[in-house]
């Protein structure tokens, strides 16, 4: 991977005429290199989860963490991304593996960006349940998921062919990773989706001491 990136850098440093002629090719190679790096990182996350590596459970500031994630996704340059955060809890802290839970929320937000049009509306909500749990939800205005696929999308490597025009780079690991991390916390996930209108996915994490 590093060798490929170095080759791209050298190629990009060619004379102006040559660089203009090959600019599109190099940009494509660079994008594919970045995509492959992201896929490998996602695969490592899934392998780590499957190997049952112990979660690093701590008390952390989930409010600040979600605010940071929202700020990151508002800076998306490929699309117009509007992100809102509705934090309804009285406490800013929760128990869980901070890094893994933030990876989960980031995966959900990434899917919202990928599977929406040029204008993306994402709503992140966080609240307590009546059973000493924290619920985090990510809603969007994307293409939605048909009822017959709403269980299959959690399967590792599953990729829907229902919307070929919306196919995005990926290997179908995002939601299976979400499922594994939520289960590792003893939690559960829920999905509400309507084709053509959008999707809402919620994760619920127990907070029992």
Locate each region found by the language model.
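Short alpha-helical segment of the dimerization/phosphotransfer core of two-component systems
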Residues: 31-36
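Conserved micro-motifs of the catalytic ATP-binding
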Residues: 51-56, 93-96
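A conserved beta-strand-to-alpha-helix junction within the catalytic ATP-binding
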Residues: 56-71
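Conserved catalytic submotifs in the C-terminal HATPase_c
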Residues: 58, 80-92, 129
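Short helix-loop "hinge" at the ATP-lid/N-box region of the Bergerat-fold HATPase_c
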Residues: 112-113
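Conserved glycine-rich
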Residues: 118, 186-187
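Short conserved segment of the HATPase_c
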Residues: 145-159
């Amino acid at each position: 991977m590093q060798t490929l990136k170095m080759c791209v850098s050298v190629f990009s440093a060619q004379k102006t005429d040559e660089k203009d002629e090959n600019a599109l090719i190099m940009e494509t190679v660079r994008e594919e290199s970045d995509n492959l790096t992201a896929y490998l990182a996602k695969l490592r996350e899934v392998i780590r989860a499957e190997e049952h590596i112990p979660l690093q459970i701590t008390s952390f500031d989930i409010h600040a963490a979600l605010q940071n994630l929202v700020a990151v996704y508002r800076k998306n340059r490929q699309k117009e991304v509007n992100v809102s955060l509705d934090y309804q809890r009285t406490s800013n802290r929760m128990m869980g593996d901070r890094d893994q839970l933030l990876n989960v929320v980031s995966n959900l937000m990434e899917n919202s960006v990928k599977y929406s049009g040029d204008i993306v509306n994402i709503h992140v909500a966080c609240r307590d349940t009546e059973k000493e749990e924290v619920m985090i939800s990510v809603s969007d205005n994307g293409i939605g998921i048909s009822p017959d696929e709403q269980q299959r999308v959690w399967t590792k490597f599953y990729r829907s062919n229902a919307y070929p025009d919306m196919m995005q780079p990926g290997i179908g690991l995002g939601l299976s990773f979400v499922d594994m991390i939520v289960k590792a916390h003893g939690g559960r996930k829920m999905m509400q989706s309507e084709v053509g209108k959008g999707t809402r996915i919620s994760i619920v994490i127990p907070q029992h001491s």
